[in-house]
């Protein structure tokens, strides 16, 4: 089952699409790209600290596999909007051209620009995850709001991710907890 919804993040001028799918490949897709043509994953879920996982720390794939054992895994895929995709591709290709022609100063500036563009994507992704945990999904737990253990994997620099930048947010549904009222 795949559900798709468009999400607009108020105040960020950034939209995107969020697809919810169920992991059926034993994490092969994210692991195949992690540490090869994309960066490692990042722990992002609000329940992570309760399991000894520092928010923002790199995901150790072996730890993820161990924690995921016996859990249904949801993949909340945040997809960049067309305007961010076009800007990202333009700067990425210019940076590669500068690098390949030996213009390291220009390449460095463009890589910084690319990081700034991609930080918008991460900001939108975090906002969507916070919203979704606040809303909660009944399939994860009847208690709402919720906190999830999430391993987020960005796909935006490999041939696979460059054409349509996105972030895989792998939710270990068995570890869902009710949020503490504030």
Question: Where are the predicted features?
Answer:
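Intrinsically disordered, flexible peripheral segments
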Residues: 1-182
């Amino acid at each position: 089952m795949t559900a798709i919804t468009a999400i607009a993040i108020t105040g960020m001028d950034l939209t995107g699409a969020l697809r919810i799918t169920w992991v059926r490949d034993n994490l092969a897709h994210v692991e195949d790209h992690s540490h090869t043509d994309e960066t490692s994953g990042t722990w992002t879920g609000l329940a992570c600290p309760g399991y000894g996982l520092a928010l923002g720390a790199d995901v150790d794939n072996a730890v993820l596999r161990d924690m995921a054992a016996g859990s249904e895994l949801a993949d909340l895929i945040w997809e960049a909007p067309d305007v961010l995709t076009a800007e990202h591709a333009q700067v990425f290709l210019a940076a590669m051209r500068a690098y390949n022609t030996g213009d390291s100063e220009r390449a460095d500036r463009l890589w910084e620009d690319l990081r700034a563009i991609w930080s918008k994507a991460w900001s939108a992704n975090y906002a969507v995850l916070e919203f979704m945990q606040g809303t909660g999904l009944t399939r994860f737990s009847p208690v709402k709001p919720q906190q999830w253990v999430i391993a987020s994997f960005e796909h935006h620099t490999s041939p696979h991710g460059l054409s349509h930048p996105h972030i895989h947010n792998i939710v270990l549904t068995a570890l869902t907890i009710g949020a503490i009222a504030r």
